[in-house]
Amino acid sequence: MEAKAIAKYVRMSSMKVRVVLNLVRGKNVNEAFAILKYTPRDAAVVVNKLLKSAVANAENNLDLNRDTLYISEAYACEGPTLKRFQPHAQGRAFRINKRSSHITLIVKERE
């Protein structure tokens, strides 16, 4: 049995989120919470909230025990990019890409 949590349109580059997801993929849920608590990245806050949601889904919807859960899959896909322009000297304009991402966490029970 697996429980899933998805965060869509998170205003953060998927490349930055993947750095944090690589730290917790395959880990026990309690160990992952400890890692995320002391990870000094903005993406850690979003992933922590998403992990809480996935654990709550597992406990409430599937009656799984929190102590036996681990993160089986964790991935971040690119969301839509907001394109903005930054004015520069002599009539020029440079484009700024404000990237977003869709983050998915799947927790399973260890056999």
Curated annotation (Swiss-Prot):
Keywords attached to this entry: Ribonucleoprotein, Ribosomal protein, RNA-binding, rRNA-binding
Query: What InterPro entries does this protein map onto?
Result: Ribosomal_uL22, Ribosomal_uL22_bac/chlpt-type, Ribosomal_uL22_bac/org-type, Ribosomal_uL22_CS, Ribosomal_uL22_sf
Cellular component GO terms, alphabetical:
cytosolic large ribosomal subunit
* Source domain of life: Bacteria
> Known Pfam families for this protein?
Ribosomal_L22 (PF00237)
One GO biological process term: translation
Q: Which GO terms describe its molecular function?
A: rRNA binding; structural constituent of ribosome
Subunit structure of this chain's protein: Part of the 50S ribosomal subunit.
Q: What is this protein called?
A: Large ribosomal subunit protein uL22
